[in-house]
């Protein structure tokens, strides 16, 4: 798409938005969730009480330091979520006054352990945290350094627009970021908490007023009407790009279908295909009917369908009678002759013997018996006693004469049999006669008529002229008519898992998982009663296979590669242990040259003098050293040894407390500023417990681990789910684990690890920031936007994606199995 076309389309889009999103002084109630009103907080609500707020227009509530459970009822929470579910533009608004050093949750929307949306303010680390889940179901945390817990009133708004995030404090834009798009596909059972994460953790202490969720673009306008609005919003732009991508995909698919249709039409133009049927060497066209013996047959959709012919009773005139005609199933009228008191059909012969014993032969012709001239008889090679006289011929035949070799009328499923003086038709075994002369026969369905010999545990299946006795499932054959129960367990012909027990049953078998395994028997997985943590896999009963970097029965213990000597970092780097792995971090005075060597070999000296990152006073000269610097007096001069810190001169020997950190003490020593944490003397009764929480002996200052079992003392720290946690006077504060920066275009977060790593292949990366200005050409030379996906032309299971100008394709194994 050309740039001019894009700008015109965006302007048009903004005009449309302007027509439908004009706001006045109020907010559409259908787009607003007034949390405090909906929760109906009052005097009977434990842990909160109504107090004066920033203004008198709405109620304000003090969240006290006492047990409480401010959780929305199920019906109320579902009303919230119905407005919020699957929306990509919404804003959190709150007016609050948080006490000093409190770390608490403002609001939390979570399902089990999955935090879909949680806003937290930490007074310990002076930062605001947003925890959320993205559309890929991965947890994310955004940290905004800001002092909110200062016992002062603040207006906070956090606006989401697709992947665009804006934080306003007191109507000032503090942060604006591009993040992974949050998921609002909230499952049933999701809970809504205010002022706490759950009953035991994340207590907010202070006052809250005007807590609202606005499901509309740029909801911060409701709190600060004078702020500027933008058009289109990020979500609008994402929607526009998505529509373009959808239209592009439809166009591509339609073009491909049209191309295939044209190819098929070209082939069809060259031939005409008609479905036909073939029977006994004769081909019949679609819907054509014909008679085959005693059946009426039709060709339907290339298949022959036949029905037994129903013969009508013929109404014959005088001197005729119904009789079978060669090649036809039903009787037809045929001329007759009357001779010596008996009726004969046309062509039928009869012998008469005279008084002298002479044989005279007559034949019915034209309704009259006429004399047939005797042409003589062939000589017989059998004795007189084996010669047989015939009723329709004056010539005798030898005993055993083959009358069937002469012309006979036996047709389908009928066989010719010789008698002493003639041939007759007889139905084959398993067939019955369709007429009295047995010339035509049909199959007997022994199964339907109960004329079979199949015994118990079998199923009767009809076949032409016979039947079969098929064994039921779970049984094996004894003979043609009998089956007995089959022990699949004994013969190892079962489908039980290797970790299951097989129990034989009548007609089948049951599979039961062995102790220590769970499942349906056909699939059994090992069960570990304490679970396998940190990505470990349960491979046998109560046996965990731990990923690299963890150990212990439940993989609960992180291996400290640094202290145990598994790693040797470069002399210019320090080994930093991380959950599951480690990092070689450049020491003070060094920085990475951009190569990010895993062992720290890429650490280079920082020229503090050249970059101005030194504390030498004006009367000294800075000399760069490997890993540091030195403040030296010019030759022949005396120096004061003063230092420069935060733009202020500190005298040599001076000691001071940092303005923004009362727990750190700095001193100036001959031009160098040395800072350290305050030394904690727990024997001193006046020790500052805020700086020395480890000196707080009170039981009320202890914390309970997230697992509900481990107890920590004030000041203790631990790592939980890629977060660094600290117990401070009874409160648990957790923040994202500090990860080394990855200055690379493509990175991947390995499974069960906390920090991303660089990769060179964009197709392996999972943290690419989609740049919609970069496009790809697919195999059909169709332009694809970054973020779009399609099925590769000519395949059914190859999915391709455009990742920042790179085409990445992979085969879906599940799709292959379904083919």
Swiss-Prot record:
Gene3D superfamilies: 2.60.120.200, 6.20.200.20, Complement Module, domain 1, Laminin. Residues 1-24 form the signal peptide. Disulfide bonds join 404-416, 410-425, 427-441, 447-460, 454-469, 471-483, 489-502, 496-511, 513-524, 528-538, 532-544, 546-555, 562-575, 569-584, 586-603, 609-622, 616-631, 633-639. One of its GO terms (biological process) is neurogenesis. Widely expressed in brain. High expression is observed in telencephalic and diencephalic glutamatergic neurons, while no expression is found in GABAergic and GNRH neurons. CDD domains: EGF_CA, LamG. The keyword Membrane does not apply. Ca(2+) binds at residues 443-444, 446, 462-463, 466, 558-559, 561, 577-578, 581, 605-606, 608, 624-625, 628. Glycans are attached at residues 56, 228, 296, 301, 520, 551, 618, 638. GO terms for molecular function: calcium ion binding; heparin binding; identical protein binding; protein kinase C binding. PANTHER family: NEL HOMOLOG, PROTEIN KINASE C-BINDING PROTEIN NELL2. Plays multiple roles In neural tissues, regulates neuronal proliferation, survival, differentiation, polarization, as well as axon guidance and synaptic functions. Plays an important role in axon development during neuronal differentiation through the MAPK intracellular signaling pathway. Via binding to its receptor ROBO3, plays a role in axon guidance, functioning as a repulsive axon guidance cue that contributes to commissural axon guidance to the midline. Required for neuron survival through the modulation of MAPK signaling pathways too. Epididymal-secreted protein that signals through a ROS1-pathway to regulate the epididymal initial segment (IS) maturation, sperm maturation and male fertility. This is Protein kinase C-binding protein NELL2. It comes from Rattus norvegicus. The lineage of its organism: Eukaryota, Metazoa, Chordata, Craniata, Vertebrata.
């Amino acid at each position: 798409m050309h740039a001019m076309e894009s700008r015109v389309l965006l302007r048009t889009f903004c005009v449309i938005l302007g027509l439908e999103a004009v706001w006045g002084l109020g907010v559409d109630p259908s787009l607003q969730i007034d949390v405090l009103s909906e929760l109906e907080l009052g005097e009977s609500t434990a842990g909160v009480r109504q107090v004066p707020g920033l203004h008198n227009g709405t109620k304000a509530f003090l969240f006290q330091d006492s047990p409480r459970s401010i959780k929305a009822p199920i019906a109320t929470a579902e009303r919230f979520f119905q407005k919020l579910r699957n929306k990509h533009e919404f804003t959190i608004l709150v007016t609050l006054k948080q006490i000093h050093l409190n770390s608490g949750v403002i609001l939390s929307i979570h399902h089990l352990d999955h935090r879909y949306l949680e806003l937290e303010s930490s007074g310990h680390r002076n930062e605001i945290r947003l925890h959320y889940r993205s559309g890929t179901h991965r947890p994310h945390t955004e940290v905004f350094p800001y002092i909110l817990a200062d016992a002062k009133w603040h207006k906070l708004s956090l606006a989401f627009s697709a992947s665009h995030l804006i934080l306003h404090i007191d109507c000032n834009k503090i942060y604006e970021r591009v993040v992974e798009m949050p998921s609002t596909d909230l499952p049933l059972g999701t809970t809504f908490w205010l002022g706490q994460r759950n009953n035991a953790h994340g207590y907010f202490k202070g006052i809250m007023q005007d807590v609202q969720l606005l499901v509309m673009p740029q909801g911060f306008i409701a709190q600060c009407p004078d702020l500027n609005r933008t058009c289109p919003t990020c979500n609008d732009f994402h929607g526009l790009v998505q529509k373009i991508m959808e239209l592009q995909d439809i166009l591509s698919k339609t073009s491909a279908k049209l191309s295939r249709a044209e190819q098929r039409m070209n082939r069809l133009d060259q031939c005409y295909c008609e479905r036909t049927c073939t029977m006994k060497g004769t081909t019949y066209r679609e819907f054509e009917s014909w008679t085959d013996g005693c059946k009426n047959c039709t060709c339907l959709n290339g298949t022959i369908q036949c029905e037994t012919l129903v013969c009508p009773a013929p109404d014959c005139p005088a001197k005729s009678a119904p009789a079978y005609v060669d090649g036809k199933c039903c009787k037809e009228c045929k001329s007759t002759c009357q001779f010596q008191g008996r009726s004969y059909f046309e062509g039928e012969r009869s012998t008469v013997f005279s008084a002298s014993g002479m044989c005279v032969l007559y034949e019915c012709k034209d309704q009259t018996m006429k004399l047939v001239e005797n042409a003589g008889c062939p000589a017989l090679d059998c004795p007189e006693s084996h010669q047989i006289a015939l009723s329709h011929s004056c010539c005798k035949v030898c005993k055993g004469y083959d009358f069937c070799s002469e012309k006979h009328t036996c047709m389908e499923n009928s066989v010719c049999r010789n008698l002493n003086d003639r041939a007759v038709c007889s139905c084959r075994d398993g067939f019955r006669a369709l007429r009295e002369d047995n010339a035509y026969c049909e199959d007997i369905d022994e199964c339907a008529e109960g004329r079979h010999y199949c015994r118990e545990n079998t199923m009767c299946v009809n076949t032409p002229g016979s039947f079969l006795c098929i064994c039921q499932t779970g049984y094996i054959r004894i003979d043609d008519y009998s089956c007995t129960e089959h022990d699949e367990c004994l013969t190892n012909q079962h489908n039980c898992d290797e970790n299951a027990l097989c129990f034989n049953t009548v007609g089948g078998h049951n599979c039961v998982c062995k102790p220590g395994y769970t499942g349906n028997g056909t699939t059994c997985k090992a069960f570990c009663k304490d679970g396998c943590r940190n990505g470990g896999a349960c491979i046998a009963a109560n046996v965990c296979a731990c990923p690299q970097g963890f150990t212990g029965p439940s993989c609960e213990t992180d291996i400290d590669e640094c202290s145990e000597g598994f790693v040797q970092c470069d002399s210019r780097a320090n080994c930093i242990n991380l959950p599951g792995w480690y990092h070689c971090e450049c020491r003070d005075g060094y920085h990475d040259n951009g190569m990010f060597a895993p062992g720290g070999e890429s650490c280079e000296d920082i020229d503090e003098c050249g970059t101005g990152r030194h504390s030498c006073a004006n009367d000294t000269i800075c000399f760069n050293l490997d890993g540091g610097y030195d403040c030296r007096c010019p030759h022949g001069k005396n120096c004061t040894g003063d230092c420069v810190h935060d733009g202020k001169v500190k005298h040599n020997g001076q000691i001071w407390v940092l303005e923004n950190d009362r727990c750190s003490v700095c001193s100036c020593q001959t031009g160098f500023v040395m800072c350290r944490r305050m030394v904690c003397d727990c024997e001193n009764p006046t020790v500052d417990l805020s700086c020395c929480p480890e000196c707080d002996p009170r039981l009320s200052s202890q914390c309970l681990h997230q697992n509900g079992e481990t107890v920590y003392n004030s000041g203790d720290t631990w790592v939980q789910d890629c977060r660094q946690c600290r117990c401070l006077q009874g409160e648990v504060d957790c923040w994202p684990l500090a990860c080394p920066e990855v200055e690379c275009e493509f990175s991947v977060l390995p499974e069960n690890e906390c920090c991303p790593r660089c990769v060179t292949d964009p197709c392996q990366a999972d943290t690419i920031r989609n740049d919609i200005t970069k496009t790809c050409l697919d195999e059909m030379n169709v332009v694809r936007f970054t973020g779009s996906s399609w099925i590769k032309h000519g395949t059914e299971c190859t999915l391709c994606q455009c990742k920042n100008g790179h085409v990445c394709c992979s085969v879906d194994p599940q799709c292959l199995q379904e083919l």
